[in-house]
Amino acid sequence: MSDAPDALGSAGASTAPAAAQVPPGTRFVRCVVDGAPVWGVIDGTDVALIEPHPFTRFAPTGRRVAVEGLRLLAPVIPSKIVAVGKNYRDHAAEMGGEVPTEPLLFLKPSTALLGPGDPVALPVDVSDEISYEGEVAVVIGALLSRVTPEVAAAGVLGVTCANDLTMRDWQRRESQWFRAKGFDGSCPLGPAIATGLDLGALRVRTWVDGDLRQDGTTADLVFDIPTVLAEITRTTTLLPGDVVLTGTPAG
């Protein structure tokens, strides 16, 4: 179940959605305090706890905990994770394919989700060619159904980091990517949801064992983020707390 199961109101094509209004620069996290998951806002070296959650009107609880030593969880539990493939031209070329003429969409199940520090149990008995894909993940802040790109952008709560782990051998073997990209733990997410950033100017960098492997920017997307979101909502409603992975650069 999503952390924000109740719709915040529909978003018509000419009406801005009722997304939670938060100051730009806010960084939301989910963490474990006293053995239970809670929401908070990063404030310097502390997390200021809030209730109930960022997808509706929230308030500080008055309690603060130190970031150091805190167990951070995936910053949201979405009803669905939607992803777009081959959304960087250099990555499409790297994969030996043509640039899509429309967003290439697929789903990852909720069981793919992991927190930012959680270990990944790679299915090495199934695949010997498991690869990383660093991506910008968009966290939806309002119910979006059949909306324009402008309305879709206004319905974004913020962005976080994702790794769209992929079994390349299975991706080549099957035309549907559910098995290649939907295995348990294939979507590490977090650590924070950052608000107020320019969706068209986000840098994407991926390191593997200290080596920089990917370095791109959302300015190079084939389909920009508002366009991707609007395209999804033509057929599938996005709910508050849903996550959209926006593509990976070459590397």
Roles of regions detected by a PLM:
Residues V99-P116, Y132:
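Structural signature of FAD isoalloxazine-binding scaffolds in flavoprotein oxidoreductases
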Residues P23, G115, S131-E133, L239:
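Residue-level recognition of short, solvent-exposed, well-ordered loop/turn junctions
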Residues M1-L104, L197:
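N-terminal non-catalytic cap/leader segment that marks the start of a structured domain
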Residues S145-T160:
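N-terminal accessory regions of nucleic-acid-interacting proteins
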Residues S2-A7, A11, R71, H91, ...:
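Catalytic-pocket segment enriched in acidic/His residues
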Residues V33, I140, T246-P249:
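Conserved "cap/hinge" positions at secondary-structure junctions
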